[in-house]
Amino acid sequence: MHSSVITFPGSNCDRDMDVALKKFGFKNKMVWHDDVELPKSDLVVLPGGFSYGDYLRCGSMASKSKIMKSILNFAQGGGKVMGICNGFQILVESGLLPGVLLRNKYLEFICKNIFVKANNKGNSYFKDDKKDVYEFHIAHNEGNYFCSKEQIKEINDNNQIALFYSDENGNVNEQSNPNGSLQNIAGVFNKQKNILGMMPHPERMIDPALSGEDGSIFFENLINNLK
């Protein structure tokens, strides 16, 4: 499996993602935002960070980078694209995913471990019959997912919600919502389910000595179901 991680000015999770992908068998290449062509890829990842310093809006300037045209063509051809945190923000700013990501409910930067419940387990990102609650890490100031009434109806009708913020038992409620996100949404797909955006960082949970192992389960499922 070949993957590409896009580096923007201000990305700070690109190397973490590179380590995670290689650990689980991907042949990964780092791609600079000013490049115009993607290398051979089965998966393209837009990593976390603060692209362009989060000026204007988070992800807005990065969504206009030269590489985004190739990513758009790749996605329209059915290629798998994943955006984590700032990468999720870039995907909504580019129109590849619905909705927007607003300031957190209490206007504070949040950095902590949380639990998420996987939805739509028939897709290649969360296809695991033994597990549907994951412990991941979040670190963001703008993770409050929001969209119009028409959009949220369409998202629910098409089963596009990938992850809900939950407690450790998988209960989705106000108490388990860290940022005010609509319907506790932590991640969404496009209609075709080949593009995923999520605020939590699975790449930070791949070493039990440092954090946890739920990210390992995520990446193992990912590569197994891309084969």
Protein language model features and the residues they cover:
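N-terminal beta1-alpha1 cap of cysteine-dependent amidohydrolase-like domains
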Residues: 1-84, 91-98, 104-110, 117, ...
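Amide-donor transfer/coupling interface in amidating biosynthetic enzymes
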Residues: 72-76, 101-227
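A secondary-structure boundary/capping signal
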Residues: 84-86, 140
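Short, flexible active-site-adjacent loop segments at beta-strand->alpha-helix junctions, enriched
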Residues: 87-88, 122
